[in-house]
Amino acid sequence: MAAPMLRRLCRVPQSLVWLRGSRAVRPGARGMLVAPRARGLFKEFFPESGTKTELPELFDRRRAGSSPQTVYCGFDPTGDSLHVGHLLTLLGLFHFQRAGHNVIALVGGSTALLGDPSGRTKGREALSAECVRANAHALRRGLEALAANHARLFADGRPWGSFTVLDNAAWFQEQHLVDFLATVGGHFRMGTLLSRLSVQSRLKSPEGMSLAEFFYQVLQAYDFYYLFQHYGCRVQLGGSDQLGNIMSGYEFIHKLTGEDVFGITVPLITSTTGAKLGKSAGNAVWLNREKTSPFELYQFFVRQQDDSVERYLKLFTFLPLPEIDHIMQLHVKEPEKRVAQKRLAAEVTKLVHGQEGLDSAKRCTQALYHSSIEALEVMSDQELKELFKEASFSELVLDPGTSVIDTCRKANAIPDGPRGYRMITEGGVSINHRQVTNPESVLVIGQHILKNGLSLLKIGKRNFYIIKWLQL
């Protein structure tokens, strides 16, 4: 009964398929595995026995009768946004897509309810089904936006494969627990599941491990089987902490079908303290503008250390390796100009936020670090609020004869009385990056008030106030 029941459990949810850039694909995608590995993007291959011949042959489009392969990677919606920690697996998918293969980004609308224990020292905080559904919807939008930017801004003239977004809730939400355990559970051995490093480390921890977390690798293995059956997916991509889960999927599929599938891992990106970049570690840099602005994302990469930037250029960009070598030669000559970091930041910001987001990040950089009046004049309200997140925002009417001290007081930027007056005369106040020392100076449009109807008031070294003038 097991095989018929498994086929029944594997109904295809056609309504949740989203495709990007699917076209007829020409043969001849050379070095599909060699190029990303040379960039340091592919870390481990599983099983090792198949990586010398079977896996390269799978992706060799020059062979007669060869067809595009399908590769997938999972993204659990434990938060409402992707973050920098997700970028490498996404870039891995994009490299396969660029070589003419089809890729699937799988949102874990069901698996997120259990919580992946891989790489964690304690259990995740439980999420409600409603929260997970909302997060899954947000992740789908984020994945679609990144795929659209990739297709629009990084085309290389080759025909690409398709980019598909699925949600595993489509095949898990209607399954009955007893049926699932009866048909799927019998194919997993407890000794093997208990031997995984992710399980061992948690069992030895003071908190232990819940049954839900323990069962996570079974559901992920079933995801792989489902995609193998319905989309011909033979390769799973994941972070290096996912190898145990990938192995479970390989063993499950091989046991049921006798076919070989494969796993590829990408390196984990860590902070300077060695912590994995992610929201759980409290150091997430988000790929959602509402949580991390294009300027903040840009600056995150501009601030990378010299000893990391070449590696990051290879990992996070599509730039050819000879071009990266040239960038590094320029960087070594004048490291203070941060040529390599700026190119890295530009490429990543453009992929995540599009050309408009990159332009915004550069405007904000000029306005904040180079005191550019020209940049301030063309900044939108949103950009100013993103740049000066702690700034107070006021809307004021420009009355005839409005002075510097009037403006400061209406914006609640200085105290009343002599103390506030002295703050101006002693040089503690600037408007639009220009110091003002005469409290009675009348505001001048074009100097104190920019063309976009805004004024940036700075008190001391760190206190900013944004004023939007009405009825100009």
Curated annotation (Swiss-Prot):
Transmembrane segments: none annotated. A motif ('HIGH' region) lies at residues 77-86. Pfam families: tRNA-synt_1b. A motif ('KMSKS' region) lies at residues 276-280. GO terms for biological process: mitochondrial tyrosyl-tRNA aminoacylation. It is an enzyme of class 6 (ligase). Keywords: Acetylation, Aminoacyl-tRNA synthetase, ATP-binding, Ligase, Mitochondrion, Nucleotide-binding, Protein biosynthesis, Transit peptide. CDD domains: TyrRS_core (cd00805). InterPro entries: aa-tRNA-synth_I_CS (IPR001412), aa-tRNA-synth_Ic (IPR002305), Rossmann-like_a/b/a_fold (IPR014729), S4_RNA-bd_sf (IPR036986), Tyr-tRNA-ligase (IPR002307), Tyr-tRNA-ligase_bac-type (IPR024088). Its EC number is 6.1.1.1. L-tyrosine binds at Y72, D116, Y216, Q220, D223, Q242. ATP binds at D76, I269, K279. The modification N6-acetyllysine is found at K350, K362. One of its GO terms (cellular component) is nuclear body. It is found in: Mitochondrion matrix. It catalyses: tRNA(Tyr) + L-tyrosine + ATP = L-tyrosyl-tRNA(Tyr) + AMP + diphosphate + H(+). GO terms for molecular function: ATP binding; L-tyrosine binding; protein homodimerization activity; tRNA binding; tyrosine-tRNA ligase activity. PANTHER family: TYROSINE--TRNA LIGASE, MITOCHONDRIAL, TYROSYL-TRNA SYNTHETASE. Homodimer. Catalyzes the attachment of tyrosine to tRNA(Tyr) in a two-step reaction: tyrosine is first activated by ATP to form Tyr-AMP and then transferred to the acceptor end of tRNA(Tyr). Belongs to the class-I aminoacyl-tRNA synthetase family. This is Tyrosine--tRNA ligase, mitochondrial. It comes from Mus musculus. The lineage of its organism: Eukaryota, Metazoa, Chordata, Craniata, Vertebrata.
